[in-house]
Amino acid sequence: MRARLLALAQARGEDFSLLLNRYGTERLLHRLSLSPLRERFVLKGALLFDLWFAAPHRPTRDADLLGFGPADAEALALAVRSLCIIEADDGMVYDPASLRIEAIRAEANYGGLRATLGGTLGRARCAVQLDVGFGDVVTPAATETELPPLLSGIAATRLRVYPRETVVAEKLDAMVVLALGNSRMKDYYDLDALRREGRIDRDLLAAAIAATFARRGTPLPTGLPLGLTEEFVTDSVKRAQWSAFVGKNRLQAAELDRVVHDLAEWLAPVLEQARRLAAARDP
C-alpha cells in the first residue's frame, strides 16, 4: 500500500507526507462507516470537494465532522479509540495511546473538539486529525454518499455528508462574523469553486443561510457583508493573505478582487431572499 501511495503522490506531483496523512484520515473515516457510531457524525469540510470535483481541490490535513450530542471530550475519545481497533484490509494501523483531545475555538462564533492520533502504513508514520463541531443545523438534510478511496481496489466509505448549501451558509456566517479580521482565504477559494460549479439551488441556499445564521445567533447583514466589499479587497493584508494562500497550496486562482466581486454578485440576491425567510419566520 505504501508503494502504491508513493506512486500516486509522484503521479499527482503531491507531497507524499500530506497524501499519507490524507490516506490515514480516509481509512479512519472508513472505520467510522463500519461502526454504529456512523449515525452520530456527518462529514463536512474540504474532503467533500474531492468528492464533488474530479480534480484535486486543495490540500487539507484534517477531516471536519459535525457531531450530534454534547461536546464531551471523553465521549469523543472513547469513540475514536473504538474506531482504532476495527480491522480493515488497507494496511493502516492506528495507535490509540497517541490519541489527544483538545477544545478548539474557531475564529468565528463556534468551537468544537479536535482529536489527533498517530498511525502507520508499513514503516511510514502519519498523523490524523479530526475536527468535530457540535450543534449546527444541516439544510437540506445530510445524505449518505459513497466516498471513493485514494487507492483502487480497497473498500469505499459510505457516510452522511453535508449538502453544498450548508457548506456555503457556514462559510458565509464566518465571513460575516469575522469581517475584516477574516484570514480564512480557503473559504473564498471554496466558495468560488462552488459558484463556478453552478449546482447549488438558490432556494435551498437561502433556506440554509437563514437556518444557519439563526442557529448560530448571527444577525443577517442588511446588505453585503464587509468581506464581500471593496474595503476587503483593497486591504493590503487581505491581498497578501490571498497571495500567500494561493502560493503555499500551489493553486490556480483568480485575483482576490475578481473572486470577491463574483461572490458578491452571486450571493447578494440569495442573502436578500434569506432575509425575507428570516423575517417571515420571526415577524
Regions found by a protein language model. Name each.
Residues M1-F41, L51-P59, A63, G67-P283:
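Structured mid-to-C-terminal alpha-helical surface segments
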Residues L48:
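Helix-turn-helix
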